[in-house]
UniProtKB/Swiss-Prot annotation:
Name the UniProt record assigns to this protein: Cytochrome c oxidase subunit 2
Localisation per UniProt entry: Mitochondrion inner membrane
Entry keyword DNA-binding: no
Keyword Transport appears in the UniProt entry: yes
């Protein structure tokens, strides 16, 4: 039986509902892993300073 303060699903009453709960848990784990990986890639790209080693001094100003 569900309680007002319960954050999860009710207990499964049938085998089909139990399988749906397992599928839900698995799908959320996959979504969480993909989101974490994308966040890691974004943070890596924002924090990594990509500089060209061939352009030294102030040559980038001359290019503009």
């Amino acid at each position: 039986m569900a309680h007002p303060s319960q954050l999860g699903f009710q207990d499964a009453a049938s085998p089909m509902m139990e399988e749906l709960l397992h599928f839900h848990d698995h799908a959320l784990m996959v979504v969480f892993l993909i989101s974490t990986f994308v966040l890691y890639i974004i943070l890596t790209m924002l924090t990594t300073k990509l500089t060209d080693k061939l352009i030294l001094e102030s040559h980038e100003i001359e290019i503009i």
